Amino acid sequence: AALAIDLNIGLDRNKVRGALEDTRLANDMYTDAHARLMITRGTKVKPFQHPSLSLSGPTMVIIMEHSKALSARPIRLSTVPHMRGLPMTQDPKLNSHSKLNCVLACIAAEKAGADEALMLDINGFVNTTNACNFFIVRNGTVWTSTGDYCMNGITRQKVIDVCRENNISVKEKNFSLVETYGATEAFVTGTFGAQTPVREIDGRIIGDKDLGPVTEKI
């Protein structure tokens, strides 16, 4: 991602790993540590866009904290008009600080009384939430979006791998809101949320219990 946006971090991969390890050890963290790595272009002489105005070169911030198991409380989603960016505008596969569309989606969902926003892609198919990847279960098969218009998260891929390794049918495909409303199970995935069940979408109850059998098996 840094190479794609012409950002020279000034450190190779091993040195970045070393900085993460140094931060972990400095905080006496040995298990279940979560590292958030953020890199900017550094301090600027003026608050303008051009990268050449940076005075100090890249700034790297490492926030190290212990991951805590989140409640298994199922969440509510609300569909919003905001979409993830397109590759020619703001590629959703770039994990950048500039995610105003996701922030606006989050605000819209909150105002609708939901926990997260369900976002569609440019073709009207179900894509992702404002912060997590999204899955449904229909007829025992796990569905998630094609991944063309969302961040293909590590936990998302782990769920797909677990399904394939355990003979659980899984598909990366286009699917509609109507198909989503008819799902028997739904869940979201993310680094902190891991695998969180979804109980309600746009006021429609999904499934007949909080944690469906396929979700529980995964």
Language-model segment annotations:
Residues T155-Q157:
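Secondary-structure junction motif
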Residues L118, F125-G147, N152:
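Glycine- and Gly-Pro-enriched alpha-helical subdomains that act as flexible
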Residues A1-L118, I122-F125, M151, I160-I218:
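Conserved alpha/beta cores of soluble small-molecule-handling proteins
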